[in-house]
Amino acid sequence: MLAGVQLSDGLKLEAIADGGFSYAEIPYEIIEKDELPTYKKKDGDSRVLKVSGFSYPLAKLTPDKMYELLENCRRYQGNYIVLDTMNCEAGILENVVEECSMMMTDYRIPVFIENGCNGSDETGYLNNAYSDISSLKSIAEYCNRLCDTAIVGISINVGYSNLLAKNVRSQIDQCSEYLCMIHANDNGGVYNEKQMPFTFTRGRGNLITDWYHIIGALIKIEFSGWMIFDNSGTFARVPEELQTQYVRMLHAIVKEWQGQFTFVERVLNKPDKKLILFGAGQMLWDYMDVLGNKFPPYFAVDNGKMRWGTKVCGVDVKAPSAILDVPAQERNVVICCM
């Protein structure tokens, strides 16, 4: 998983680099206004901040603009172009690709089409032609047929999904073969606030956005694309002297999420041992949904006597003492904490 932060008004490139990231996503309007801003390195600093790619509103896309985007993406060594579909009519990308397919194939720069909706914070938000994953898949399939290669992929904007009360886990499952990017931003489901992940809770700390299950869904499909934090709402209000600390928090979130990806290889991938999971509640159900086929447990144990002798997704649930029935050198006991 490759991670970066989207540049936004008020956020400085120095903060992104000092915060630990190697990639910055650039809204193309910055390039249109002026050259890409540079950042100052400290003495002895070996960091390199690279352009992950450009973001651009699909509503403004034309064949000439597509050429300009591809040319500048190559110039700045970007890796993709992601198209924002908020308040956008249907058919725009298809029409552009019909005219530009050969050029896009020659450049070989991936183009990601993102989920979106119509509306504003004042009027509320409704579905548009790009709200459903099935529509995005149809667009990607059509464009890739025109290009005769896989050029167009899908980006899921978590915040936009929240505005329409979409199930992000289900969206990830639906487009797994096309999913190339996640735009990670948070809101309360009403306003397009673009805050940092984990910002919004309900009641006594219940997350409005189910980030852990979103990451679980990405692990399930073995996601290896881009995770870009587009948190312009946060950085519009953070004092400049605190920007680096906030970016470091984002970097810590990435490390924690990446740790969940590597957890599989570090802890579960021990084929010479019997996997025993400790805990047979909801987290065991979640484990079986995400990893059960790849790393099936030998059995599970639980402190709750009511669960002993039951099965969860075909896995026997036993008393903790059953662990001792398996020789120590043959067992791999893992606390189930999906």
Predicted regions and their residues:
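Short amphipathic alpha-helices and their capping/turn segments at secondary-structure boundaries
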Residues: 14, 34-45, 68-74, 95-103, ...
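Acidic-and-aromatic substrate-binding clefts and catalytic sites of carbohydrate-active enzymes
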Residues: 7-13, 26-38, 57-65, 86-93, ...
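Gly/Pro-rich active-site loop or hairpin
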Residues: 63, 122-133, 160-224, 313-319
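Active-site acidic/histidine proton-transfer and metal-coordination neighborhood
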Residues: 58-153, 163, 248, 254-261
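N-terminal pre-domain/capping segments
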Residues: 1-79, 109, 148-151, 255
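Core-facing hydrophobic residues within beta-strands of well-ordered domains
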Residues: 21, 179, 224, 295-297
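Hydrophobic, well-ordered beta-alpha structural blocks that scaffold small-molecule cofactor pockets
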Residues: 241-338
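Conserved beta-strand positions in the central sheet of alpha/beta enzyme cores
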Residues: 25, 81-82, 112, 155, ...
